[in-house]
């Protein structure tokens, strides 16, 4: 009998395909949801929310990780980096998932992926994030601050600022993270 499918493992696989192999998020997520259509609606919604949310807030999440980890995001092993990214997303944006569950599941996932030697690191970073998230200082001014706040690359923000000015750029950036209306076809 096969091992039960774990939603966080699926999220990790999708994030790895996108961040390490350059897959298009909408395509790979669609394929994965089609492959696992037998999962309950709640599980599929979790996979979608964590994957899309992690990607939408990637720059901010990487900033947060860099504040709480001695190893910078760019130097982390790709699997560990993406486990931590999805964990930070859950800690910051999903109140329905308890902090201890996020940490515990991330550690289990690291072990399942062959990184049992880094389980203490994963646990330590995520527990530090959970404790310190509310007191974290973000940059307040400049393009870097906008980039982190809205998770938009600085090069795009610079182009917008050059073309549209600072105020329009700020408005456009804020609109990217607004909740999108539901569309039914």
Feature roles, as predicted:
Residues 1-185:
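Class I Rossmann-like S-adenosyl-L-methionine
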């Amino acid at each position: 009998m096969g091992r039960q499918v774990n939603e966080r493992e699926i999220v990790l696989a999708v994030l790895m395909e996108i961040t390490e192999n350059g897959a298009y998020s909408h395509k790979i997520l669609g394929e994965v949801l089609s492959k696992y259509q037998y999962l309950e609606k709640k599980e599929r919604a979790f996979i979608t929310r964590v994957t899309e949310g992690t990607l939408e807030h990637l720059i901010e999440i990487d900033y947060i990780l860099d504040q709480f980890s001695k190893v910078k995001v760019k130097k982390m092993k790709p699997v560990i980096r993406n486990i931590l990214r999805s964990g930070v997303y859950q800690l910051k944006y999903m109140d329905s998932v308890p902090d201890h569950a996020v940490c515990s599941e991330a550690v289990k996932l690291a072990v399942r992926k062959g990184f049992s030697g880094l389980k203490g690191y994963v646990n330590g970073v995520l527990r530090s994030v959970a404790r310190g998230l509310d007191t974290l200082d973000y940059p307040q001014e400049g393009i870097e601050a906008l980039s982190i706040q809205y998770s938009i690359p600085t090069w795009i923000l610079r182009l917008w600022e050059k073309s549209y000015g600072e105020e329009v750029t700020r408005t456009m950036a804020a609109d990217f993270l607004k909740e999108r209306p539901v569309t039914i076809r």
